[in-house]
């Protein structure tokens, strides 16, 4: 930790101890972490002298909307409780970048692709997409469960597609998913932008997904 007022986290203060996984209930990526720092000093608790105490640290990250939260569980012989740790902006950035790096190392895909692929493969309802404005952002939702699959600030390209017919498609055996505006024949997002572009879609017989 940095030697500042907040004891600010640094990347060396934690490790992803188990594999990250998609949380279908909360629509985020669940990341178990090891605490390599003084939890008493950082969280203002007092367990250093309790041999029965155990701290479980984890983060929940949604790369589509850019939301990340951190929680810790305290388990002792006499009590157990969970609390959220409210990160500073600097810590939020540090931990987000670390999660992105570890996702690439372990899954060989960006967090966004991991999130969307896992969501699609575990979704237990039909996927009917709608593009609409919410506050100062424009989002593509699954209307059946409220999951956000893509987002841009208002004024960007996505805002031009509000009210249009939006579909989810996949192409070939590459397990590449894309979000498309059928009215404009435009790809709004591809889960693997390096391997697929608009020309690839024109050359391949893409099939719409009805789930």
Tell me what each language-model feature is:
Residues 145-153:
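Short aromatic-glycine motifs in intrinsically disordered, low-complexity regions
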Residues 203-205:
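Acidic, Ser/Thr-interspersed intrinsically disordered low-complexity regions
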Residues 5-13:
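Amphipathic alpha-helical segments
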Residues 207-211:
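Non-Sec secretion/translocation targeting segments of pathogen effectors
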Residues 24-26, 30-115, 122-128, 135, ...:
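Acidic, low-complexity, intrinsically disordered interaction modules
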């Amino acid at each position: 930790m940095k030697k500042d007022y907040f004891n600010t986290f640094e990347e060396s203060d934690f490790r992803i101890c188990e594999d990250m996984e998609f949380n279908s209930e909360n629509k985020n990526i669940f990341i178990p972490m090891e605490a390599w720092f003084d939890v008493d000093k950082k969280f203002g608790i007092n367990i250093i002298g309790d041999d029965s105490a155990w701290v479980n640290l984890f983060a929940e990250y949604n790369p589509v909307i850019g939301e990340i939260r951190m929680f810790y569980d305290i388990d002792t012989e006499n009590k157990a409780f969970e609390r959220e740790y409210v990160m500073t902006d600097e810590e939020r950035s540090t931990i987000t970048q670390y999660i992105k790096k570890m996702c690439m190392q372990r899954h060989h895909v960006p967090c966004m692709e991991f999130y969307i692929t896992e969501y699609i493969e575990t979704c237990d309802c039909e996927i009917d997409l709608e593009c609409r404005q919410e506050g100062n952002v424009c989002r593509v939702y699954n209307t059946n469960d409220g999951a956000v699959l893509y987002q841009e600030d208002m004024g960007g390209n996505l805002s031009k597609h509000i009210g249009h017919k939006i579909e989810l498609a996949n192409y070939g055996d590459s397990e590449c998913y894309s979000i498309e505006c059928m009215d404009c024949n435009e790809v709004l997002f591809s889960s693997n932008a390096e391997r697929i572009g608009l020309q690839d879609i024109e050359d391949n017989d893409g099939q719409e997904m009805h789930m």
